[in-house]
Amino acid sequence: MFKDFNISSFKKTKPPSDNSFDTDQEIKALKKIPLRKDFVKKYDNIEKAFEQTAKDNNVKDYDKKIAAKLIKESAPVILELKKYHNRPRPYELDKNLKAVKMKSMNTPSYPSGHSAQGMLIASVLKDKYGKGPAFMQTAKNISDSRNMAHAHYPSDSKNGTELGKQLYKHIKTT
C-alpha cells in the first residue's frame, strides 16, 4: 500500500536538535501539560479508540480490520523515519520529566507514529462511514495523548499528523 510512498520530504523535515533552544522550549511546554494517565491509556490502543468512536456514533457496519490493516501497512514508513531521525524521547533528555510509560514507547520519538496512524485512519474512516468530526476528534485525542504522556514533543505530534495526511493522500491518488 505504501511501498512507493515518497518518504524523502519527511527525511528532509528534521526535528530540532537535542540541545537546541526549540527542544528546550518543547520540554518546558510538556512540563506544563499534566500527566493524565487515564486519557493516555484510553488512546494508546489506536484500534480500540476508533472502534469505540464508531460504537459511540452508531456506526453499525464498522469493520475494525480497516484500522488494523492501516496500522500494519503504515508501520514500515513510520519506523524508517523514526530510525532515520533517531530523536530521543523527551523523558530521555530531561530525566526530571515524568512520563506515562507504555509498551508503544520503545522506538525513537520523531515522528509520532500514533499521530500519523490516527490521522490516516480517521481520514479513511471518515470517507467510508461519514462521522468526520467524531473520527477526526479521535485522531486529535490520540495525538494529544502522546504529549500528555510526555512520550512526544509537540513537533513530533505535529509532523506525525502531517505524515498521516500525506499517507492518506497517497492512498487516494494511487
Where are each of the predicted segments found?
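Short, solvent-exposed mixed-charge patches
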Residues: 1, 173-174
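Interfacial helix-loop-helix junctions of multi-pass membrane proteins
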Residues: 141-172
